[in-house]
Amino acid sequence: MLNKLKKAALVGSGLLVLAGCSSESADDASVNSEAVGAERLVVGLDDTFAPMGFRDENNEIVGFDVDLAKAVGERIGAEIDFQPIDWAMKETELDSGNIDMIWNGYAITPERAEKVLLSEPYIVDAQSIIVLKDSAIETKADLEGKLVSTQQSSSSVDKIMEDESGIFGKLGGDLVLYPSNNNAFSDLESGRVDAIVVGEVYGRYYMKQSGKDIYRVLEDNFGEDEMAVAFKKDNKELQERVDAALAEMKEDGTFDEIYDKWFYSE
């Protein structure tokens, strides 16, 4: 069964391929275009945001988005440099020309769409419900009377409390809140809670790193955010080249190879 992250990738791939077939600009944006030439493009990122972009034990910037950007760079004939930035100033850095792209788990919002030019969404981060594989919980409604854990002060808390199903008022107790999602996973594994709610991107990364095949992600969730690459409003040419490269990567399996390196799949 495809998880939501991969489903989003396949949907995005189809949209991009259709766009490439129907638009004259796609020819100009071909990832094999000789006109591209060698160039350097700067990606702005928060280098503490695992698994999208962060520093490893050797202080090297690594991550899912980092690997994607490098692969895209190879296809469009560009060297990709990664520049840590103040995340609160990311759009300012882009507008000033200090960076060419924001590529770091950048969620699409109406406000952001007014400020920047966005790529096609390439991944979805759901507020996922995660249980142990042998759990009887199959849907959001099954959380009634159950203990649920999540990270304190996270968007997950608000999503659970505001969910239109009203499940928050039917839980088997107060939300069990911890400083980090890692604590929530520990509670789930030990049986102290019945389910946890966490962003799917981080959740699947954690499960991949744990090496334990004991978890199950429900189809039901508490909402979804699409992620995209951001460009300056007037940089349509770069947007089209990146979109075309990502579409090719989804078609030829490169995207899945990078995905499977970083994320857990059932």
List PLM regions with ranges.
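Bacterial signal peptide processing site
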Residues: 22-24
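Ligand-binding cleft/hinge of the Venus flytrap
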Residues: 69-77, 156-177, 207-212
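Extracytoplasmic small-molecule ligand-binding "clamshell" domains
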Residues: 28-105, 252
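Periplasmic-binding protein-like
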Residues: 47, 124-131, 200, 204, ...
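Short loop->beta-strand "edge-of-pocket" segments that line small-molecule binding or catalytic clefts
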Residues: 41-45, 141-157
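A ligand-binding cleft/hinge motif common to bilobed small-molecule-binding domains
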Residues: 89, 106-114, 161-162, 187-190, ...
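Acidic, polar ligand-binding/catalytic clefts
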Residues: 70, 79-142
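C-terminal motif of bacterial Sec signal peptides marking the signal peptidase cleavage site
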Residues: 17-20
